[in-house]
């Protein structure tokens, strides 16, 4: 192992792929452990959420012995979800990050439809709306989700 991830400057998130979806299975996303290094607001916010989710996943693995992992979703049709937390290879938490109060991302709707038991969130950095869609997707400020994590 070499490069910035060997120095613990960045970490990688692998893609989530399941038999019933046409997911991209090779590309990994990279995030800075120091999310303040990211210059643009939207990507910096996504990086901040990645750090919080990665910390929570590691806590659940190390302290509680859970078989959980942090992934993301992107398919060949261009649908994407920023984060998919899986337990025993099954999605348990879907998280999409937005800077403001945007409409529901189609990738999130797509995954929620296929994995109805998973909790689905679209969180925003600056948005104020807090509601649940008819599909069962929670739209809320980021703090609402992040404060539930360790």
Positions of PLM-derived features:
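Arginine/glycine-rich "motif VI" loop of SF2 helicases in the C-terminal RecA-like domain
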Residues: 59-62, 110-118
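Conserved beta-strand segments of alpha/beta enzyme cores
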Residues: 69, 119, 136-138
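Accessory nucleic acid-recognition modules appended to NTPase machines
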Residues: 1-91
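Domain-level recognition of nuclease-like catalytic cores that cleave nucleotide substrates
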Residues: 127-150
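Active-site-adjacent loop/helix micro-motif of nuclease/hydrolase catalytic cores
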Residues: 101-109
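Active-site ExK catalytic segment of metal-dependent nucleases
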Residues: 91-101
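Short, hydrophobic beta-strand segments that form beta-sheet elements in well-ordered domains
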Residues: 95-97, 118-124
